[in-house]
Amino acid sequence: MPEQNHARHSVVLSETILNVSTAEPIQFIDLTDRINQHLTENEVENGTVTVFSRHTTAAIKINEAEDLLIEDFKNMLRELCPSGRTYNHNDMSRRQPPIAPDERPNAHSHLMHLLLSTSETIPVIDGRLALGTWQRIFMVELDGARQRQVMIRCESYHPHEKAETVELRAVEGGIGRSSAANQRALP
């Protein structure tokens, strides 16, 4: 019977927040290079990365970065969820408090988000995102122009002889300003 390898692995967690400024009501912003930069800076070789939008009117999607196709995406979203329709959410006189003082009539943006998604999880192999040839990771603004936050969270797997702790690195304000934080061992 062949000998089985039961090597234990440790997991290193790294997180960062990307601050993203948007300029258009519907805008596709390619985050792929910034995510690859985070992988390099945090020495993520093998594992997964989750890209998460902290908003209900900004989505995360993987697709092709071709200008005409992106215009088709925008047109589809506008046709499915037009801004000029009457929506219950936009009737501030009927809304339950609390209502933000700068609340926008943006039901169409929330409906578009429902068709997309809040996050994507991508495998990382040999330090690179395991994306297909044409795949790119987008933050999709649905209610711009705004300031947005996108979380990048990596789980990197290491054999025990390389790493014996789980290290959580938190970065506020963008890539490149890493500060080491809580370290704890995994069972």
Task: Report each predicted region and the residues it spans.
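Active-site histidine-anchored catalytic micro-motif
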Residues: 2-187
